[in-house]
Amino acid sequence: MEKRKLVLTIIGVVILAMVIMVYIYFSKPGRDEKKNQQTINQVQTVQQKTDEKKENTEKNTSGDELENVTPGSEEYRGFLLDNVLHSPNEGDIHYNVYIPDAYDGTKEYALYVTLPGYQGLYFQGVGENIRTEDFGFEAQKYITDMIIVAPQLNDWGQTSADQTIELTQYFLTHYIINPSKVYINGYSGGGETLSLVLAKQPELYTAALMCSSQWDGAYEPVVETKTPVYFVIGESDEYYGSEPFKEAYQQIH
């Protein structure tokens, strides 16, 4: 009996000691302050990177050119969000842009333009195109020296096609771009916009990728310029079906 009491007493002392040690550990002065400072440092680092990308966007547009562009202030996975090109002909064109940190204007870079589906249009929210589609991020895996532009258009019709062409020409004019490495893709409604873009100025683009969409534009300009167009769609796509792409392929091939 006495032995059992002794064992219970020892166990109680050990538990009490553990409780005291835990209390002392979590009550150390400066512990919370250190964690808070780490969080502040992380936030400041993200803000610094955003400011650097904004500065990189601004330094490539100066004077009258800068007056035509309003740089964004928020960053998402390396993209500077909601920049606005104020075009006298096509109105305000909202776009997100990824400019590699190494870009300094001393050598030519490739250009990739990605057109969103319905869920990524501008009225759906800033950055929704790159938050819901991975085309811009996948492109980075193929060519590291590449500027990626993700416009947030307002529809999938002629106005958006004209704005896409205007934005492409803006980057070709104001950035050091290799004209033989200009790529474009369109997903769903963005694919319809892409077909209208290619019907108007296919010579701007080296190659095009259309995913889960249909061809709304004319075929002849693409045939004449021999611009490569790649079609990707499920055989039983729930919205478009595969027949529109099969027809477009036959017309262009």
Label each residue range with its predicted role.
Residues 2-109, 192, 197-200:
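A domain-start/cap signature at the N-terminus of enzymes
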Residues 173-174, 180-224:
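Primarily recognizes the serine-hydrolase "nucleophile elbow" in alpha/beta-hydrolase
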Residues 111, 115-165:
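Active-site machinery of serine-nucleophile hydrolases
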Residues 117-121, 153-158, 188-192, 213-217, ...:
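Solvent-exposed loop/turn segments at secondary-structure junctions
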Residues 108-109, 122-128, 161-162, 196-197, ...:
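Short, solvent-exposed loop/turn and secondary-structure capping segments
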Residues 107-111, 143-147, 178-182, 202-208, ...:
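Loop/turn elements at helix/coil->beta-strand transitions in domains of secreted/extracellular proteins
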Residues 102-103, 107, 156-188:
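Gly/Ser-rich "nucleophile elbow"/oxyanion-hole loop immediately N-terminal to the catalytic nucleophile
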Residues 206-253:
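The feature captures the conserved acid-bearing segment of alpha/beta-hydrolase catalytic domains
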